[in-house]
Amino acid sequence: MSNRPNSNPGGSLRRSQRNTAAAQPIDHTLAGRNSLSLSVGSLSIPDPDLEAAGTSGQQGRREGSSTRALKRSSVSEPNITFSPSPAKRPKVVSSHFSDSSASGPSAPAISPEVTEPRKAPASVSTKSKKRRLAAEPAPARALSKKSSSYPGPSGASSTPSQKRKKADATLLSSSSSSSLPSSSSAAGPLPPRSEASRAAKPTKLASKSAASAKAGCSTVTDSSSSSASSSSSSSSSSSAATGTNSCAPQGARLKQGKDQSKARRSRSASSPSPRRSSRDKEQSKAAGSSKFDWASRFNSKVNLPKPKLSLPGSAKAETSSKPGPSGLQAKLASLRKSTKKRSESPPAELPSCRRSTRQKTTGSCASTSRRGSGLGKRGAAEARRQEKMADSDNNQDGANSSAARTEETPQGASASSSVAGAVGMTTSGESESDDSEMGRLQALLEARGLPPHLFGPFGPRMSQLFHRTIGSGASSKAQQLLQGLQATGDESQQLQAAIEMCQLLVMGNEETLGGFPVKSVVPALITLLQMEHNFDIMNHASRALTYMMEALPRSSAVVVDAIPVFLEKLQVIQFIDVAEQALTALEMLSRRHSKAILQAGGLADCLLYLEFFSINAQRNALAIAANCCQSITPDEFHFVADSLPLLTQRLTHQDKKSVESTCLCFARLVDNFQHEENLLQQVASRDLLTNIQQLLVLTPPVLSSGMFIMVVRMFSLMCSNCPCLAVQLMKQNIAETLRFLLCGASNGSCQEQIDLVPRSPQELYELTSLICELMPCLPREGIFAVDAMLKKGSAQTTEGAIWQWRDDRGLWHPYNRIDSRIIEQINEDTGTARAIQRKPNPLANPNTGGHLEVRREDARAQLMKEDPELAKCFIKTLFGVLYEVYSSSAGPAVRHKCLRAILRIIYFADAELLKDVLRNHAVSSHIASMLSSQDLKIVVGSLQMAEILMQKLPDVFSVYFRREGVMHQVKNLAESEVFLTSPPKACTSGTASLCTTTITTATTTAASNVTPDLGSPSFQHSMDDSLDLSPQGRLSDVLKRKRLPKRGPRRPKYSPPRDDDKVDNQAKSPTTTQSPKSSFLASLNPKTWGKLGTQANSANSEPSRTAGVSGLARVPPKDSVSNNRDKIKAWIKEQASKFVERYFNSESVDGSNPALNVLQRLCTATEQLNLQMDSGVECLEEISSIVSESDVSSFEIQHSGLVKQLLLYLTSNSERDTISRDERIKRFLHVFFGCPIPGQEPPGRLDPTENGPLLALVHKMNNCLSQMEQFPVKVHDFPSGNGNGSRGSQALKFFNTHQLKCQLQRHPDCTNVKQWKGGPVKIDPLALVQAIERYLVVRGYGRIREEDEDSDDDGSDDEIDESLAAQFLNSGSVRHRLQFYIGEHLLPYNMTVYQAVRQFSLQAEEERESTDDEANPLGRAGIWTKTHTVWYKPVREDEEGCKDAVGGKRGRAQTAPTKTSPRNAKKQDELWHEGVCPSVANPLETYLICDPPEGITFDDPSMEVILLLRVLHSISRYWFYLYDNAACKEIIPTGEFINSKLTAKANRQLQDPLVIMTGNIPTWLTELGKTCPFFFPFDTRQMLFYVTAFDRDRAMQRLLDTNPEINQSDSQDSRVAPRLDRKKRTINRDELLKQAESVMQDLGSSRAMLEIQYENEVGTGLGPTQEFYALVSQELQRADLGLWRGEEVTLSNPKGSQEGTKYMFSSRGLFAVPFGRTTKPAHIAKIKMKFRFLGKLMAKAIMDFRLLDLPLGLPFYKWMLRHESSISSHDLVNIDPGVAKSIQHLEDIIRQKKRIEQDRSHTRETLQQALESLNMNGCSVEDLGLDFTLPGFPNIELKKGGKDVPVTIHNLEDYLRLVVYWTLNEGVLRQFESFREGFESVFPLHHLQYFYPEELDQLLCGSKSESWDVKTLMECCRPDHGYTHDSRAVRFLFEVLSSFDAEQQRLFLQFVTGSPRLPVGGFRSLNPPLTIVRKTFESTENPDDFLPSVMTCVNYLKLPDYSSIEIMREKLLIAAREGQQSFHLS
């Protein structure tokens, strides 16, 4: 982080930046963490193939914190897993390597060559260390030789740092110097510290550890050094021994270990304990090591009940925790003594690394090891069986000691496990610890000559004995302390024991506390907790219990007994510290045992004295309340009822976290009670609705996006299931609230113009759902009866009974097919049993709902009748907004929900109100558009709407339905025999969004709530769209259970368990294959609110949701689905026929029908636009009149033929045309723009201003485009489990947890590379193809063998080639060795494996007939279940180089200068010798075509409209090229051409993370973006540019920066999160430009993000890097460089070396100084080098999201985009306005000369006289004294000998042409060629085609200066850490900033952010946002005496609380002026 401190009022003011915690005490409060956690966080470097979840880790990764100095692992590896036994997938060893690029941080180690240690971060989810080491190559041996302080390999194993940390823990708890953690200490513990001191600072040792770890040295004394050193050998030997393990059970255990470590981290992540971070460090040690039981693995998500199995011998488990045989212990002790010296000095070689290459496996522990384990199939099966039994036994007692576990180990299992044999039977606490100790012993014995292979047969026995011995050491200390705790009567001894117990637990984890006697210690601590008279004992006892739950997560099952005692401390508070500690413990307990707390009355107790606690304790109390509400049942409502008023009042609190916990509490209550109307009314009785309504409209918003969604959804549920609450909300003016949320603050009374505020699709969906539920339900008969068919067939939804299974908390869950398959698999693996039950389905009887309906009318409908004014106000307020949301949304979910809401409004509004409301909306054209949709739901809804409108307003709509094409479309539907039978290839979204396959699944989706006959009228909002926030949402739940058993705080259970069946209800699609696995995966696609499910889900948004609750809803058979679809089609056909018959058959449709008048006029005028006859301009005038004066509809424009005819009229250039094209365009401009008639141009300057008719034409054409286009949108949205994971993050989770199975095969055509014999591999679907190449090449598969070499079996299959690994690491563009094929298709290297398989595999081709992206966004199940064959063969020499994905060299080749070509040489000869220059190209020529341009390959019904709009835009932009003297301006601003519908689709597409990760952008989007960029606004094209131009990590980073809510869920754990490498360089400010050139030379073309630090300054990261680009931009403007035209100026506020330096300035932007033919080559070379550097700098800035501060002119950007051929004299004004004005006068003389010469009346004498009389301001041309040299550059001749040629009236035209050409082209050609060459060495220039020249300044330099208003600042800036928006200082600041002028703004921005300019979008786009925090001082200090300081890395402004606004203004300006160009410590 970069700090710019200003602490001294008058002293030198410095800016500082820093990232290490140790030197930044002032900011600990800012980070919200204590010192220890900061130091740990800054040292936590994410492992490349893992993700860090911590805050510090994230900042370090993103902002380039100082921890980036630590080196990364050496080479990247694809995420590949061996799967030798596909049939037994759960038992397969799977080792994961994550994909990344060839170089970069994301690569896990193949051969770790690391010189500095790295600690595994607290939140990193590591794989098993055994697996890491097994894959580690031999050269790692040398690492220990360097010093006794082990520099652990960062990529391979975390064991060394673990040992170092273990030694820390040993020192803390004991003074013994033994290097083995098992040694107990007789010495006393460290002196205890108070809680305050613990919170205030870390332990000395921990601080020291953190600091020294950074320095790369060990933290402890000699003995710990020896420990660290010897641990290196132990870890390696452990890995070697493990290489012979049996593969099947081992793999399962390794995976579990990883998952459980995740669970531990997530559990402790939110704990407020001050020692959490040090614990986190310890926890990372156990990642992947722990063996743990299946049931507890699933506890956190599936909550399986405890099994009812027992094993012989398990009864004595608890009593056998004594140390093992004393003989072995003594031997080990003596062995340790004798080898102590040896271990202190590094061994010459690590014997543990000696392995047979045959033992190595490709990324697996032992999956393909050729050395057998000695077990046959029978033995392995027995081992697996025994392991399962042990697993299930572990379920029953997670706290048993290690010795007990070892005694349970069956004999048969031991033989299969080698050295780690006991792993399968021991608890997670000791397994890894013991394995590594065993490895250490093995290493020591090998060092003494013991053959390592002896450990194979003897390993299991040795390890069992060894585990007993080692485990006893850890538990003996606890046993001693336990005796102290139980010393009744001796309170001092009990206190001492409690203090020591705290210390033991605070530094321990499951590894170091193996065998800890939880069941004995907890009762003793509970006893101490009840000693009311002794505060210290109670405090330490409660702390110990808290620490125990952090260190040993499973102990919470025992600590739950302490709940009553904890609650006692809250009922009567004697000691506030004890009460707050009790709350901390209860909060941890509530994550898994909330039911126990609730039933003990804990919810009320926690809230009893809420206001007396500190803010952290209050947050804990509210978190407990929220967790208690998670699974509350109606029977338990009384536990929470009394607390509701307090919770309701809490919603008005200032603290954001408290408010969010309270909201979560109510959301869960409403969710659980949604079918209990009386309870919902009680929950909402105490001002809840009012308070939440106020909460929603707070500005700036208090709620995060996820919580906002949850709260709005809660309202929807309440309105849906309790209509009287909807009535209450309507009376509370909820309509205005909703309008505010969708449109922002209203501007006065103008409600006609509706501008939606930016909202995510999920937010829009919930808001429209709420509007829908506020209106009464639609009826169930008549035209709405079909809605029931749009859901699943009712036969499947009305089962009389449902089956349920019970979890550990006693909750019953619906048991459906997916559950069945998953749980069967779990049962098979674990032997788990669980209770099930059968119960009646309350919604089975379809008549029930009907009776309810008869009994009571909907309260909402009553309100509509009783209070029509309120209803009218509601409808008028929201109808227009809803309509706008529908029009501007691309996602089908939102559109369906809007359609339902609009249908409800139209149905219940009376005719007069409807007429008023619909007056300003083109409803008819929208209905016509919907009727042409491919989506059945849209078609049905539009027919229903048309019917209602015709019933209510027949007079109005009988005309409009004809004119807008509704009648035409309905007739088509009525007449179509085969409706929607064969879908088009491209399915479409929006108005036409569903193909038949889509419908197939849509109709089977249990998604609609329109089933009137099934239950209450508003039965559950969440079922009708799978976008629910429920953890029970099937996909996320299944995946969590199956793959990611995190055991931390549960995600909010926001939807009921009944929602579990949603995926099941969404059914197998008819194309699903029959294998169980594939049908399971096929049904994993919940077609949710993004693309499909919601199409079925939301259109029928009537609130009855039976299918969701029916639990056992069956999957309908294919016939049923097809039958339903056919019924719907039949209904549509029938309804359309009735509609036509009823409303349109009675009239005779002839020419007299008034509805056809406009169409007939338009057809007549269009026919006259004939190219073969001259019909004058009358037809154009008629068209202009119709378009601009009448309300001509899109339908009429389409059907009149106007589009096609006008396109031909403007583009045809045939010789047969009677009028030339230019003439026709001028006529068009005359009619539509007011230009003169051709041939009658006036003599003066042409500057027409009337653009009305052309603007109207463009708008009509855009409407046609919106109605006709059918572009598909590929979105991958899944039900969001917790309200946070929106927009595809659930789909990312799917990719996170699934892999593709590929069989690598050598291509049949080649025999000169090795054949892959490793069996199928599992590959990360988002890995790139080049990752497979890297994987194979570093193992020797890329080496071409000589003919005489042996066969494939050379014993080195798995050997990693170190040189190749290093080559991949060091070179970003390594030469490709292998190429890959699927079938006959050659795969591009930069394509993802998923995309390759989906696009090219045979299965994919077969399936493409029956599926598409819309129906199965994740692909058919076959993609995930079948094995895909990928062929590889070596790259031929002639092919090498052309296949590379990197664009650097290719770009250079394309832009190589062509001066040497004969044609070019001839042209230059003519220029120099004869003064002949090329004519200026007319840019219009490239656009005036009537066929699609080269860049367009898609086909769409709207193609002609697109081409016409492209022509109209080019005419608007370049019309002045057709005239001699026209003003250079656009007729219509480009913004008027933006198409809102296409923009919505593009934005929706670009917000889908999965599309970006897979590179699966639709072709229409990229092609339209380049050929018709005017359809999209700049920010959309900017995002499209970043997605297509760079690597996917940059694209993903850009997406996360612009859409932070995507990152709110678990993307830190995601292996698809962006991993951008960062490279740091140190720069000397005195040689800035020189060193910048050097840096760009070295790193310009690197994919790594460049980060800058300055010499003698500590700052690094975002701020200094931003400043680097700004300062280099400034340096490039120095006058002495001679690069630019302009005037020399000095800076107004120079700093350092800037004083006395002159800079170039031009009011219109900088442009290159021209070269003449005689310029010295040395000078040219120097200038060219600078321009080449400028090109690299600009490209690198764009690539790294940095901003330059370089004001370049428009002609410069035209050169960038290769538009130089069309640069003309019009552009001179943007270079030198003075010269441009003079040339304009001279051009006027030329025009006068031409008119005189054309005048036939002149004789030769009078002609000569008239020409000589021409003058400029009274001065003749000859008298001007001009010659043929360039104005302002007398040394540059315009042609050879030009300085001797005077300018006369006769050669004036040649002179002007040459001046323009030399200024804009010839004189600057070499500079721009060098510039392009430099630019293209970074990335190709053609990617900039998305932008216009005038937009490149925004792309490069950000937004231009604009006024800052207080409102914008309030919305975009974030007060924090001491300030709120109401704080005086914040209000002062906004007022001061809003008064700044442009220069002051630049100074302030450079001070705070490092760059003097904001990104496009201003403060809204600043990332991170500007945060104002309070700068604190001692009580004796006056804030007015201090200056503000900043942290540029995170854009923090640390602002003192000044006493007046004048003082603040003064101090801010001083700081901004003086605090530049330095980054030092605060």
Swiss-Prot record:
- Please list the reactions this protein catalyses: S-ubiquitinyl-[E2 ubiquitin-conjugating enzyme]-L-cysteine + [acceptor protein]-L-lysine = [E2 ubiquitin-conjugating enzyme]-L-cysteine + N(6)-ubiquitinyl-[acceptor protein]-L-lysine
Q: Which GO terms describe its cellular component?
A: nuclear speck; nucleoplasm
Q: What is its main location?
A: nucleus
EC number per UniProt: 2.3.2.26
HECT domain sequence ranges: 1919-2026
Q: Name the segments for region: Disordered.
A: 1-437, 1008-1123, 1441-1470
Swiss-Prot/TrEMBL keywords: DNA damage, DNA repair, Nucleus, Phosphoprotein, Transferase, Ubl conjugation pathway
| The keyword Membrane is annotated on this UniProt entry | no
Q: Where is the active site?
A: C1993
Tree of life domain: Eukaryota
Single biological process term from Gene Ontology: heterochromatin boundary formation
The pathway it acts in is:
Protein modification; protein ubiquitination
Q: Which Gene3D superfamilies match?
A: Hect, E3 ligase catalytic domain (3.30.2410.10), Hect, E3 ligase catalytic domains (3.90.1750.10), Leucine-rich Repeat Variant (1.25.10.10)
* WWE domain sequence ranges: 789-876
Give the compositionally biased regions (Low complexity): 94-112, 135-161, 171-188, 199-241, 412-430, 1068-1079
> What SMART domains has UniProt attached to this entry?
HECTc (SM00119)
What is an example of a GO molecular function annotated in this UniProt entry? ubiquitin protein ligase activity
Under which main EC class is this enzyme filed? transferase
Where do Basic residues bias regions lie? 1040-1053
The biased composition feature labelled Polar residues covers 1-10, 32-42, 73-84, 359-371, 392-404, 1094-1104
Entry similarity comment: Belongs to the UPL family. K-HECT subfamily.
**Biological role stated in the UniProt entry:** E3 ubiquitin-protein ligase involved in ubiquitin fusion degradation (UFD) pathway and regulation of DNA repair. Part of the ubiquitin fusion degradation (UFD) pathway, a process that mediates ubiquitination of protein at their N-terminus, regardless of the presence of lysine residues in target proteins.
Q: What is this protein called?
A: E3 ubiquitin-protein ligase TRIP12
The taxonomy runs: Eukaryota, Metazoa, Chordata, Craniata, Vertebrata
